[in-house]
Design a protein with these regions (language model features):
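Hinge/capping helix and adjacent helix->loop/strand transition within the periplasmic-binding protein
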Residues: 52-58, 79-90, 102-193, 243, ...
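N-terminal (or domain-start) structured segment
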Residues: 23-114, 177-205, 296-299, 319-326
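C-terminal lobe and pocket-closing loops
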Residues: 212-280, 310-313
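Ligand-binding pocket segment of bilobal, Venus flytrap-like solute-binding proteins
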Residues: 69, 152, 157-239
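Bacterial N-terminal signal peptides
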Residues: 9-19
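Short coil/turn segments
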Residues: 34-36, 96, 131-136, 158-163, ...
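An extracytoplasmic/periplasmic, membrane-proximal ligand-sensing/linker region
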Residues: 266-326
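Bacterial N-terminal signal peptides that target proteins for export
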Residues: 1-10
Length: 326
């Protein structure tokens, strides 16, 4: 009898906790990688942006940032589409690399329509970095060493063969008559882990993103050899030459933004879209975005969804031509 009553009380407690817990669910941004990379940059920028007075909502606590690495984003994606489909208070960071993984089938049978795309808040660019004490002073120095003996240079990056970081260095290699298949490529879980490996000497080069480099180069321990943009970037990386300036016509833009689960209500989804539109229109957000190393790019809702569908299809065609489709 006592055990039966105890079970009933326990069940009642769970129901009560669940009801009130749902009402007080903390607003969070989920970064599908380890701390210190571009996904974290996205979440931290949104965390600051939502506190702008014109955008902040009464009684809303600070955005919590959580991390769910694994499978170069696949673990977080699968968590949202299978178990957390209706969590309106959970924003998930994505990048152009996420779209590349979708195109190549690295998220299994995932499709663009599996989630609801909220907003793209800025554009990042690829970059190539080494340690401050590296013998490679320029991008040309590095490529000359790779051409002479690719086995002696270890390149770290987020993702596996076929990922956007792999493609960046591969495009530079091809333009220097180097077979990308000869490169020593170490797959790591996010840009933060790649820079940690670089600092520790486990890799000699990082193929990553400018926002990550902005974060990790502040102490002078990292030398950035090139940014993969059409023109030099403003802000902290203003003195870094582009690959084009060094004779290599390679540019790699990367959008950054967030999505929510597929069963988030229309009302909640539209609320997020309108709120991000308002946030991205403020001069305060423009300053915050520039400080993170991101450039101007703002798109949301249906327009963003259409853009992503086209981008994924373009990536799929390119990847198929390179034999990278699973």
């Amino acid at each position: 009898m006592n055990s039966a009553i105890a079970r009933i009380c326990a069940l009642a407690a769970l129901v009560t906790f669940g009801t009130f817990g749902a009402q007080a669910a903390p607003l969070q941004c989920l970064a599908p990688a380890k701390p210190g990379g571009g996904m974290a940059v996205t979440c931290k920028l949104i965390q600051k942006g939502l506190q702008i007075p014109a955008v902040a909502e009464a009684q809303e606590g600070s955005l919590k940032i959580s991390y769910l690495p694994g499978g170069i984003g696949a673990v977080a994606w699968n968590s949202i589409v299978s178990q957390r489909r209706a969590e309106a208070d959970t924003l998930v960071a994505f990048s152009g690399g996420s779209l590349m993984n979708l195109a190549q089938g690295k998220y299994g049978d995932a499709d663009v329509s599996n989630v609801r795309w909220v907003a793209a808040i800025g554009v990042d660019y690829g970059m190539i970095a080494v340690r401050h004490d590296s013998p490679y002073k320029t991008l040309r120095d590095l490529l000359a060493a790779l051409k002479k003996n690719p086995a002696q240079v270890t390149i770290g990056a987020a993702g596996t063969v076929g990922s956007q970081d792999w493609l960046k260095i591969s495009m530079l290699a091809r333009q220097s008559q180097i077979d990308p298949k000869t490169l020593r490529f170490v797959a790591l879980e996010g840009g933060g882990e790649a820079f940690t490996a670089l600092r520790a000497g486990h890799v000699q080069v990082v193929s990553g993103d400018a926002s990550e480099a902005t974060l990790h180069s502040l102490d002078g321990e990292i030398r950035i050899l090139a940014v993969l943009s059409e023109q030099r970037l403003p802000g902290a990386l203003a003195q870094v030459p582009t690959a084009r300036e060094q004779g290599l016509a390679v540019s790699w833009p990367i959008i950054r933004g967030v999505y929510v689960g597929p069963e988030v209500s229309d009302a909640a989804y539209q609320h997020w879209v309108k709120r991000f539109d308002a946030m991205m229109a403020t001069p305060e957000f423009t300053q915050l975005r520039a400080a993170t190393g991101l450039s101007s790019f703002a798109m949301s809702g249906d327009q963003l969804t259409a853009y992503i569908k086209k981008t994924v299809e373009d990536y799929r065609k390119q990847s198929d031509q390179l034999g990278l489709i699973r």
